[in-house]
Amino acid sequence: MPKKNEAPASFETALSELEHIVTRLESGDLPLEDALNEFERGVQLARQGQAKLQQAEQRVQILLSDNEEASPEPFIADNE
């Protein structure tokens, strides 16, 4: 597992670690200080994941700008 301030190798790794943190926090078994540390790491991972998603979206926009027939449309998740 990466060190506390180290960025995960990939988006998928960050997401997996974030899911693990959520599970531990939801269990309610962590002491307060550990829970705060886990929460802090979770916030870091969420921000890193959001940044990676924004970078991917920018790459898609660049690729689509080369193809004038294709236009990007907002993504709407089915589960919302």
Swiss-Prot record:
Family matches, as Pfam families: Exonuc_VII_S
Subcellular location: Cytoplasm
Signal sequence bounds: none
Group of enzyme by EC: hydrolase
EC numbers for this chain: 3.1.11.6
SUPFAM superfamilies: XseB-like (SSF116842)
Gene Ontology cellular-component terms listed: cytosol; exodeoxyribonuclease VII complex
Coiled-coil regions listed in the entry: none
Membrane-spanning residues: none
GO MF annotation: an example: exodeoxyribonuclease VII activity
Keywords associated with the record: Cytoplasm, Exonuclease, Hydrolase, Nuclease
GO biological process, one term: DNA catabolic process
Reactions that this protein is recorded to catalyse: Exonucleolytic cleavage in either 5'- to 3'- or 3'- to 5'-direction to yield nucleoside 5'-phosphates
InterPro entries named in the record: Exonuc_VII_S (IPR003761), Exonuc_VII_ssu_sf (IPR037004)
Function: Bidirectionally degrades single-stranded DNA into large acid-insoluble oligonucleotides, which are then degraded further into small acid-soluble oligonucleotides.
NCBIfam families named in the record: PRK00977.1-1, PRK00977.1-4, xseB
Family: Belongs to the XseB family.
PANTHER family in alphabetical order: EXODEOXYRIBONUCLEASE 7 SMALL SUBUNIT
Assembly with partners or alone: Heterooligomer composed of large and small subunits.
Protein name in UniProt: Exodeoxyribonuclease 7 small subunit
